[in-house]
Amino acid sequence: VRRRAAEAVLDGTWDGGNGEPAGKPQADLVSMARPLLADPEFVNRAARGLNAEINHCIACNQACLDHTFGNQRATCLVNPRAAYETELELLPAQGTKKIGVIGGGVAGLFAAESLALRGHDVTIFEAADTLGGQFNLAMRVPGKEEFVQALYAVVNRLEGLKVNISTGKAVTPEELQADGFEEVVVATGVRPRIPEFPGVAEGLEGTIDGVTVATYAELISGKKAPGDYVAVIGAGGIGYDVAEFLLEDRQGEPQSLTSWNSQWGVVEDSDVHGNLSSPKPERPQRRV
């Protein structure tokens, strides 16, 4: 590309080279900022060919840029030790313990990793069939497909640390005690907050005058199907994500290049100045 282009060519990526073998660089210069907050070992892992273990930046800006703009210490949503390394030290444990982590969401996975790095014998118990918790919902939202890479990376690291993983069954206190667990970490996650509006509780069990009532988790997971005209109660981050999901409804599949180009007015015809034309956004499937 460089030999044919008069301008500099830039790219944004969050992994260690899209699987390219170490020692075969495809770029003249690599510049990183946020990815090094997410994983200070980024370069070392990439050099050793451990791209699948790189802790991925999900470009959320919530703990790095947002904190910086608020005159707070910058850290990282997927690496809470970022900028706290001298305070949250992962020192070798003086005695190995058998520890159970209840919940295989993001908090449980990272807690298990920290404990295993200190030398403990760790088992994760997840009642659902898959690990990831809320990340499994977030990665279905258009624009957040990259979240899946962060989830895969921590699971790969846990496998390397020989962390035991049990899914598809809730564990009881009696079972934990019988199996000799010395410590238990509770990381069971969150549930959608149900507003105390008249009829909402009843609607979640069925419908209200033919209108479906659903939580964000039920909609995004596909447990309930949305209609053609949807009201979203709540305008925070989750409400916005739900609206995006409902308008595109791609079920977390990456958008095709052809569709993206059309939506943003990018054309491949080199005779067009700047390779731009009038954008042609796709018509939303429903009103929100």
Model-flagged regions — what are they?
Residues 166-179:
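A conserved short coil-to-beta-strand element within the FAD-binding core of flavoproteins
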Residues 98, 227-229, 287:
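Residues that mark the start of a beta-strand
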Residues 1-102, 106-122, 130, 193, ...:
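Flavin-dependent oxidoreductase catalytic cores
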Residues 125, 180-189, 231-233:
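Short hydrophobic core segments
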Residues 47-50, 140-144, 203:
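Short, hinge-like loop/turn segments at secondary-structure boundaries
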Residues 79-92, 156-157, 165-167, 190-276:
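Glycine-rich dinucleotide-binding loop and its adjacent helix/turn
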Residues 28, 182, 228:
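Conserved acidic residues
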Residues 101-167, 235-288:
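Beta1-alpha1 glycine-rich phosphate/pyrophosphate-binding loop at the start
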